[in-house]
Amino acid sequence: MKSLLIIALLVSVVYILLCSLAYFFQEKLIFFPEKLDKDYKFVFPQRFEEITIQADDHEILHGLLFKSKNAKGLIFYLHGNAGSLAGWGGVAEVYTDLQYDVFLLDYRGYGKSDGRIESENELFKDVQSAYSQMLKYYEEKNIIILGYSIGTGLAAKTAAENSAKMLILQSPYYSLTDIVKHAVPIIPPFLLRYKLKTFEYLKDCKMPVVLIHGDKDEVIPYNQSLKLKPLLKTNDVFITLRGQAHNGMTENPDYIKEIQKILAE
């Protein structure tokens, strides 16, 4: 009996330690930024300019604005949880070829952006600051918000609180809590400080919504989009990319065909 009590105590201590680590270090478990020197030189085939945005707390955020000839509007792009614009900037060409300018934001702590991510609300405010800055240059009726992977929750939140032309979500999740619950079921959901409730934000999106997901996604399972599908409005669009994994979606010829049709409307 004494041995069982000792084992139970040890298991409890390990579990409490694991939960504590998950709570206090979750930024390191969710976000994987690549830092760039301030004098880093970006190289891309199309025209672009570097943009700085002052966040609410006066940290300076960094973005890239890619320019298209005879642009019909702007793609406001929110990228995934790893890397920086040094890599993510490569997606812009797909959209500039379709006559859309593209703005990409590096979240705080990513690329040349100052600071570090410390809260969900801070992230929301940063994205809104960048969006508000783009409104100085583009009419909102011509702005499409596009989120990829972890950026989908941020994109849906931003769309819910603004009046963009359209919302496009690539590999979205029902909520970050739901992802963690299935990936690491021993961690209580209440410990997660980044909820990113895409399902709640979609309910407030009045603009057309497009969900695009690969059915072989090994990072954000395809069933996450299937859970979101019932929340779509009558004229919203749900697209399945057969055989598509999590990475490389933008280069998928089927994705390009679908996005051509969507942006031609």
Name every feature range the model reports, one short phrase each:
Residues Q244-D254:
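Catalytic histidine-centered segment of alpha/beta-hydrolase-like enzymes
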Residues I7, V11-Q54:
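An N-terminal hydrophobic leader/cap segment in hydrolases
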Residues N252-E265:
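Catalytic active-site module of serine/aspartate enzymes centered on a nucleophile-bearing elbow/loop
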Residues Q133-V184:
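Primarily recognizes the serine-hydrolase "nucleophile elbow" in alpha/beta-hydrolase
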Residues D56-Q133:
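Membrane-embedded segments
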Residues T198, M207, P221-P230:
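Short alpha-helix in the alpha/beta-hydrolase fold that links the catalytic acid
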Residues K216-I220, H246-N247:
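Acidic catalytic loop of the alpha/beta-hydrolase fold
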Residues C205, L211-H213, D217:
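Short beta-strand/loop motif that positions the catalytic acidic residue
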